[in-house]
């Protein structure tokens, strides 16, 4: 338990520094090394067309944001996006492959299989602007594609009286 608490504290501290890190980066100017110096080793690297690639910086399960930072073929940062937004969630539709969901949203905070229903819930914690903590869930029945989605209050959020 102490180990998990330490991990959660470290993740929250890291996420708290994100606005400062972001302010130090500039699209078209900052290099991949600049990004890695500020954000560290990415959780995943996604290849893009034309020699570009996207670095995934995951703030789950303790945080409420995930960042995708695209590095162009020229080695310069071309985009920095916080991807856990209602607009991105609206793009997740039934039938979409989970690999594409993972690519769009980053690693979920939690994956929970429910044996009786045959469903698996993939949950991402996020903030509905300005400060409402919610959970976006993608439900699969075959483990490979989206059956449906839903958004619910984040009952584990400190704002709701139950910190992690």
Q: Locations of the language-model features?
A:
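Residues within mature, well-folded domains
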Residues: 17-164
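Sec-dependent bacterial lipoprotein signal peptides
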Residues: 1-15
């Amino acid at each position: 338990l102490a180990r998990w608490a330490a991990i959660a504290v470290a993740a929250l501290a890291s996420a708290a520094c994100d606005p400062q890190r972001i302010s130090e980066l500039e699209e078209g100017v900052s290099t991949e090394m600049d990004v890695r110096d500020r954000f560290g080793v990415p959780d995943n690297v996604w290849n893009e067309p034309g020699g570009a690639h996207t670095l995934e910086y995951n703030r789950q399960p303790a945080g409420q944001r995930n960042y995708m930072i695209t590095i162009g073929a020229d080695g310069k940062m071309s985009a920095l996006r916080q991807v856990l937004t209602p607009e991105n969630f609206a793009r997740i539709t039934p039938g979409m492959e989970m690999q594409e969901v993972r690519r769009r949203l980053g690693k979920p905070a939690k994956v929970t299989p429910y044996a009786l229903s045959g469903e698996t819930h993939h949950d991402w914690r996020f903030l509905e602007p300005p400060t409402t903590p919610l959970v976006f869930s993608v439900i699969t029945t075959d483990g490979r594609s989206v059956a449906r989605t839903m958004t619910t209050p984040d009952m584990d959020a400190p704002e709701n009286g139950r910190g992690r």
